[in-house]
Amino acid sequence: MNKLISAVLAAGAVVLGSPAALAAGYPEKPVTMIVPFVPGGSSDITGRSVTPALAKMLGQTFVVENKPGANSAIGAQALARSTPDGYTMMVGSIGTFAINEALYKNLSYNPSKDFTYLTQAVRNPNVLVAATSFPASTVAELVDYAKKNPNRVSYASSGTGSSDHLSAVLFRQRTQSTGVDVPYKGGGAAIADLIGGQVNVSFQNVGAVQNHIKAGKLKALAITGDTRATDLPDVPTLAEAGINDMVVYSWQGFAVPKGTPQPVVDKLAEALRTALREPQTHKTLQGLGFEVVANTPQQFAEFQQAEVKRWKDVIQKANIQLE
């Protein structure tokens, strides 16, 4: 009899401890959402925009924890080393999940091996802008000027390895032109010097410069997206301007540490996709210049690998590497 009771209890423990059972009860406590950047940036905004809907759907608080530093490596390393139980997740950027893998020689985490990807949340294109004092007002004029004046065109960026910096590198590779990179500590400083005419051109986030464009403080030459930007309908895409294979988006997405039970991954990913499509969240993100993607874990994982390969090729060709 005692053996029978023990067997029944053991079987019950197996069922209760199974991944499916864990997912059914998940989450049973607050979930930490790491943001590997300071408050107020794109990843931070994306993460905070979905937490109310997640809390409502899943019945637990989602606590945003900013862990900035080392171009997002500090926060990403914290996620990689966390317990893979679904109670620690992260919202990161194209840099966190793709560019850093190719850019840094001694990266403290591996984007392709340390994480399970949940959903690519949002994306937004860059816009190629020029100082009003710069002679070129179209992509063709810029390329022509750059070829006639080797290494004279200055490209401002928010920092080495940023999406705006690598957009400039890719642009020069595609057009077989030259230029000088001028990295700043953030996009704000780069934009200020661009408006002041201290630098010539830059690839900047649409939302960050559209008001300056509309006010006539900057000239917009082209959009890096596959379609024209809703807020800048008169600005052509790079493809329309004759530059092929240069569709570039900055993007944010969500991940958990590798080893998180699949049922928990599926439940959290579905909740995130639903939260991103929630009307108010969707409207808020669109108003900030983001396009909601909300794809599946498999789609995001495949996209992440494609992005790593793409930017690794660009970075290696340009011989860029950071310690």
Description of each model-found segment:
Residues 28-30, 173, 177, 214, ...:
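An extracytoplasmic/periplasmic, membrane-proximal ligand-sensing/linker region
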Residues 81-87, 94, 102-189, 238, ...:
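Hinge/capping helix and adjacent helix->loop/strand transition within the periplasmic-binding protein
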